[in-house]
Amino acid sequence: MPYEQRSLRLDGQRRCLRLEPEFWSMLERIARQEQQALPWLIDRIDRHRQTGQGTGSALCCFVIRYVDPNGNLRDYGKRVLSA
């Protein structure tokens, strides 16, 4: 499966992130549900990732935790998004 690359600013620095299109789609869906811009959501997740964890990995883990097995959005992530 091909990766999709996007460029955005995180913590004031320009970054390129590569994820599968399905992860980008879910991140966009989560951002809409939270009524936030996608860059804001990604910045929040990036700021709360574990030491040594890559940004792409943190984004994928966030999506997996946020979405239930049936594809419905959960309330998970409020701590990260509201911090």
Where are these regions (language model features)?
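Amphipathic, hydrophobic secondary-structure cores in small proteins
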Residues: 5, 9-63
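C-terminal structural segments of small proteins and small subunits
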Residues: 54-80
